[in-house]
Amino acid sequence: MDNAILKIGDIIESKAGRDKNRYYIVMKIDEPYIWTCDGDLHKVDKIKKKKIKHTKYVGYQSEYVKNKLEYGEKVTNSEIRRALKEFVESKEEGSCDDAKR
């Protein structure tokens, strides 16, 4: 899938840099950059600016995080970590129920 159609709440994987192979959730989009968060190294109050071309869309989205951001509600670091943990666990099992595209 083309990274040009990334949306808020999408889960991406870093393809370059020190954080290569790390998962993030897209918090904000301003092409050619996205602002991402993992709730651990890059927390909600200090989101990471990343070039879109250095990321890979993994095909899933956190509906919970997306909905909170769309309604202007605050997302916590623990909610981000939980969403990413659920994605990784479901990926290992072979399916992800949060939201497929």
Predicted segments with their positions:
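Ferredoxin-like alpha/beta domains used as RNA- or RNAP-binding modules
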Residues: 1-8, 27-101
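Short, well-ordered loop/turn elements at secondary-structure boundaries
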Residues: 20-21, 30
